[in-house]
From Swiss-Prot:
Job of this protein: Crucial player in the regulation of plasma cholesterol homeostasis. Binds to low-density lipid receptor family members: low density lipoprotein receptor (LDLR), very low density lipoprotein receptor (VLDLR), apolipoprotein E receptor (LRP1/APOER) and apolipoprotein receptor 2 (LRP8/APOER2), and promotes their degradation in intracellular acidic compartments. Acts via a non-proteolytic mechanism to enhance the degradation of the hepatic LDLR through a clathrin LDLRAP1/ARH-mediated pathway.
Sulfotyrosine sites (modified residues): Y41
Protein name: Proprotein convertase subtilisin/kexin type 9
Disulfide linkage: C226-C258, C326-C361, C460-C530, C480-C529, C489-C512, C537-C604, C555-C603, C565-C591, C611-C682, C629-C681, C638-C657
Top-level EC class as recorded in UniProt: hydrolase
Boundaries of every Peptidase S8 domain copy: 158-470
UniProt remark on domains: The C-terminal domain (CRD) is essential for the LDLR-binding and degrading activities. The catalytic domain is responsible for mediating its self-association.
Superkingdom field: Eukaryota
Length: 694
């Protein structure tokens, strides 16, 4: 995790501090750290008045920019910094800010070098300078934050094709409606041996090269060694014999050196190269394969988000550190399809003392052990490699095939189909740490059928938030992708001490929120995110009744159906807590909760959308209660009905609603105290009207 550094200095005290002591305080290597919702890094917050150059327009300027660096000390690159400017910063202002930093540094006797200016991916620049100048740089206008550069690494340490491509797809050629394959895959990796028979004529080796020097003065740059990782992955994606998407065009960008090591800044420049290529010569669908991982990087994740918004599909390796993938980038970026690795038995890949990463930031797993592919040793040689790089290459190939058949598929549609048609429940979850098992998907990738074979199936996925803090007011937030509808929200706490969940609008987007309770250890928010064409969804809530009555809420608009129920407790006293109830018999289409809870109903209208409730209860001791939707129906909402037992919460696993129970030791519970899981199941029949099925 690394050693954290944080400082907050009140400026009236600054004149009392010697300059050297002040600098040490600002750049201290130890102290309390700050952690982002989706990662681990070190952050320095400054709130200092600018006194640079005596300029009147800056005398009142207070720097609120932050300094971030990788939490893994050995991966840091001190002396090279990515200066990220505010999103609205104009092109001329970027250049002026870089020039201003150079000028002011020169006045203090420092020489700095601007290595690259980012215009197209995000506003900012890459600079080589002394750490003594960080305080100066953080106080410049337009600066949002500065991130110290750090290393990224390659993630590699014939059953694979049979596993992901069913027999009936093996001989198929994927082409767009006009008969051509227009998909292009960009590979950010080592160099590639383009003359290998597997990929000859299919790979364009660009002139892009942004790599650090190899470690060690005696390192011998043997060509076959330099090309090994990239050549192998290119063969996995589009090789003639061992490729997933045979014939797909591939562009090679060199961002990893002969030792498989690169930098965050080099990866950023590579992504901007792709963006510039888009702007100069628009083409068909683009897939970017990122078979590398470094420590959590806010700017690398932001760059992936910006590129994804242009229609590019990014696929990344989860990482080979047998750790939470959310601690690494680009794996932790929500806009990236993140892939873990499995072996021939569909079990997590072990690589010595390490292995595949896991957790809520992983979307699915794919073959990544002993994968046969092109070898750079000769133009006809093959070799096996292992790791999440190979797994990500498989999914990139699958995505390329899907886009070849249907070029208009969006990132949200691709991800939902990959999840829906994956092989489920084959991974032994005991391999993962206990606290990560519920968060890690039990999914192994397969090639989905085309749209006309899916029959208009309603597609949903479960999105977990980061774990909230332990304070009584700590909240967790789970978000769907912009194209998805948030159909329900639930929460989960390992201690059972939580104050519920609800849906609210933040920045024009509906988000799922969960609230921790006094004495709790933290809570997760669990969102159910679905693709519902032409949907019109809304949230209705009723405050706590507080009069010995149940709290009721239903869908107000005509033709709207209930897709989920949530609740938020107004009281701290857990002894009176009861979960909200979905009354499918006496009160169809309503959410009903305890008198002390505010209850929320998620309601949607879409052509042919129909929903119903399914319940299942157990009165005896049980760690969990489950209820599943039938074939043809999709789980959109999951919660637990009232009972005397304290529950840990409820969440969706594929088409299964899981209610977790706290006091499993009590064997004397009556039927009235049964724990009942309640699922809302929906389906889409475009020819029918929206309806509630009783």
């Amino acid at each position: 995790m690394g050693t954290h550094c944080s400082a907050w200095l009140r400026w009236p005290l600054l004149p009392l501090l010697p300059p050297l002591l002040l600098l040490l305080l600002l750049l201290c290597p130890t102290g309390a750290g700050a952690q982002d919702e989706d990662g681990d890094y070190e952050e320095l917050m400054l709130a200092l008045p600018s006194q640079e150059d005596g300029l009147a327009d800056e005398a009142a300027h207070v720097a609120t920019a932050t300094f971030r660096r990788c939490s893994k000390e050995a991966w840091r690159l001190p002396g090279t910094y990515i200066v990220v400017l505010m999103e609205e910063t104009q092109r001329l202002q970027i250049e002026q800010t870089a020039h201003r930093l150079q000028t002011r540094a020169a006045r203090r006797g420092y020489v700095i070098k601007v290595l690259h200016i980012f215009y197209d991916l995000f506003p900012g620049f890459l600079v080589k300078m002394s750490s003594d100048l960080l305080g100066l740089a953080l106080k410049l206008p337009h600066v949002e934050y500065i991130e110290e550069d750090s290393f990224v690494f390659a993630q590699s340490i014939p059953w694979n094709l049979e596993r992901i491509i069913p027999a009936w797809h093996q001989t198929e050629e994927d082409r767009s409606p006009d008969g051509s394959s227009q998909v292009e895959v960009y590979l950010l990796d080592t160099s590639i041996q383009g003359a290998h028979r597997e990929i000859e004529g299919r790979v364009t080796i660009t002139d892009f090269n942004s790599v650090p020097e190899e470690d060690g003065t005696r390192f011998h740059r043997q060509a076959s060694k330099c090309d090994s990782h990239g050549t192998h992955l290119a063969g996995v994606v589009s090789g003639r014999d061992a490729g997933v998407a045979k014939g797909t065009s591939l562009h090679s960008l060199r961002v990893l050196n002969c030792q498989g090591k690169g930098t965050v800044s080099g990866t950023l420049i590579g992504l901007e190269f792709i963006r510039k290529s888009q702007l100069i010569q628009p083409s068909g669908p683009l897939v970017v394969l990122l078979p590398l991982a470094g420590g959590y990087s806010r700017i690398l994740n932001a760059a992936c988000r910006h590129l994804a918004r242009t229609g590019v599909v990014l696929v990344a390796a989860a990482g080979n550190f047998r750790d939470d993938a959310c601690l690494y980038s680009p794996a932790s970026a929500p806009e990236v399809i993140t892939v873990g690795a499995t072996n021939a038995q569909d079990q997590p890949v072990t690589l010595g003392t390490l292995g595949t990463n896991f957790g809520r930031c992983v979307d699915l797993f794919a073959p990544g052990k002993d994968i046969i592919g092109a070898s750079s040793d000769c133009s006809t040689c093959f070799m096996s490699q292992s790791g999440t790089s190979q797994a990500a290459a498989h999914v990139a190939g699958i995505v390329a095939r899907m886009l070849s058949r249907e070029p208009t598929l969006t990132l949200a549609e691709l991800r939902q189909r990959l999840i829906h048609f994956s092989t489920k429940d084959v991974i032994n979850m005991a391999w993962f740490p206990e606290d990560q098992q519920v968060l890690t998907p039990n999914l192994v990738a397969t090639l989905p059928p085309s749209t006309h074979e899916t029959g208009g199936q309603l597609l949903c996925r479960t999105v977990w938030s980061a774990h909230s803090g332990p304070t009584r007011t700590a909240t967790a937030t789970a978000r769907c992708a912009p194209e998805e509808e948030l159909l329900s929200c639930s929460s989960f706490s390992r201690s059972g001490r939580r104050r519920g969940d609800w849906i609210e609008a933040i920045g024009g987007q509906q988000v799922c929120k969960a609230l921790n309770a006094f004495g709790g250890e933290g809570v997760y928010a669990v969102a159910r995110c679905c693709l519902v064409p032409r949907a019109n969804c809304s949230i209705h809530n009723t405050p706590a009744a507080r009069a010995g009555l149940e709290t009721h809420v239903h869908c107000h608009q005509k033709d709207h159906v209930l897709t989920g129920c949530s609740f938020h407790w107004e009281v701290e006293d857990l002894s009176v807590r009861r979960q909200p109830a979905l009354r499918s018999r006496r009160q169809p289409g309503q959410c009903v909760g305890h008198q002390a809870a505010s209850v929320y109903a998620s309601c949607c209208h879409a052509p042919g959308l129909e929903c119903k409730i399914k319940e299942h209860g157990i009165s005896g001791p049980s760690e969990q209660v489950t209820v599943a939707c039938e074939a043809g129906w999709t789980l959109t909402g999951c919660n637990v009905l009232p009972g005397a037992s304290l529950t840990l919460g409820a969440y969706s696993v594929d088409n299964l609603c899981v209610a977790r129970v706290h006091d499993t030791a009590r064997a004397d519970r009556t039927s009235g105290e049964a724990t009942v899981a309640a699922a809302i199941c929906c389906r889409s029949r475009p020819s029918a009207k929206a309806s509630w099925v009783q």
